[in-house]
Regions:
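Acidic helix/loop microenvironments that form the catalytic cleft of cell-wall polysaccharide enzymes
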Residues: 53-74, 168-172, 218-225, 236-239
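Proteolytic processing junctions in secreted/extracellular precursors
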Residues: 6-21, 133
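Conserved alpha-helical segments that form or flank metal/cofactor-binding pockets of metalloenzymes
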Residues: 171-179, 198
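Substrate-binding/active-site groove segments that recognize
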Residues: 36, 43, 181-205, 222-224
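Catalytic and substrate-binding regions of cell-wall glycan-acting enzymes that process beta-1,4-linked
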Residues: 58-130, 238-239
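Export/targeting segments at the very N-terminus of extracytoplasmic proteins
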Residues: 25, 29-51, 127-174, 216, ...
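Extracytoplasmic/secreted envelope proteins and their assembly/folding machinery
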Residues: 61, 144, 148, 161-165, ...
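A short, structured beta-strand-centered segment in the mid-to-C-terminal lobe
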Residues: 204-217
Length: 239
């Protein structure tokens, strides 16, 4: 389900490029935010303050959508320290609706990699809470009972239930078997690459060629893959 558009994107000029020292602070700051989010502890005071588009729950979702390598590239590009190749720009574009004020910024080849990355991240940052609010208002309704039971059944959760509910809503509209791209399955829309990675890293839990459609199994796989991609993403930021 497409996120809704919200505030208008305001480009950042190239003179605001971040140096390596500030980038290291941003990475450290982001990692501290992730730890506080998972543990539900107060965030430490940020010096310098990380821009909203580089922190927040949407940044836990981007590695799932773009892959850890892609998410790290986007993070670095938004910090002025990496370039986005045409293939990456195209992938960003297909994940932003054409009606969004961000769409043309990402589409425009004259825009810098930094401007494109910031536009993409601002779109998700500024709309995530709207998506979350809608997801949480729906999950308690009888027609979404299967999705709620599945998310509640996740073993050893390391991500908050509200975040997982929002991701499931973003991926499948809380439908355990949406009729969309046949390569992606279930509540969390697990694809072939994600399934292969789950089997490689967690062979004790994931086996076989078929991605599970069972809501509980799919929700567990969705949770585990979100955790895996975020762990790898944070390592990629250091490389």
């Amino acid at each position: 389900m497409a996120l809704k558009k919200f505030h208008e994107f305001q480009p950042v000029c190239e003179s605001q490029e971040l140096n390596e020292g500030i980038f290291r602070n941003l990475i450290s700051d982001f990692k501290n935010w992730v730890i506080s989010f998972w543990k539900k502890t107060p965030e430490a005071k940020k010096v310098p303050k990380t821009p909203d588009y580089l922190s927040g729950e949407h940044m836990l979702y981007i590695p799932h959508q773009q892959g850890p390598d892609g998410a790290a590239k986007i993070f670095k590009a938004a910090s002025g320290l990496a370039k986005l190749d045409p293939a990456t720009r195209k992938k960003l574009l297909v994940n932003v609706p054409t009606g969004s004020v961000y769409y043309n910024t990402i589409k425009d080849p004259k825009q810098t990699s930094k401007q494109v990355a910031i536009a993409f991240l601002k779109y998700y940052s500024e709309n995530w809470n709207l998506l979350k609010k809608e997801a949480l208002s729906l999950i308690t309704k009888p027609e979404y009972k299967k999705a709620k039971i599945a998310i509640d059944s996740i073993q050893n959760p390391q991500l908050p239930k509200e975040f997982l509910t929002t991701v499931a809503f973003k991926e499948s509209s809380l439908n355990p078997n949406p009729k969309r791209n046949p390569n992606y399955k279930g509540l969390f829309q697990i694809g072939p690459l994600a399934w292969a990675e789950l089997k490689r890293l967690m062979p004790f839990r994931y086996k076989g060629n078929k991605i599970p459609l069972d809501p509980k199994k799919n929700a567990q796989a969705g949770h585990d893959y979100l955790k895996i991609t975020n762990d790898v993403f944070q390592k990629k930021l250091q490389s």
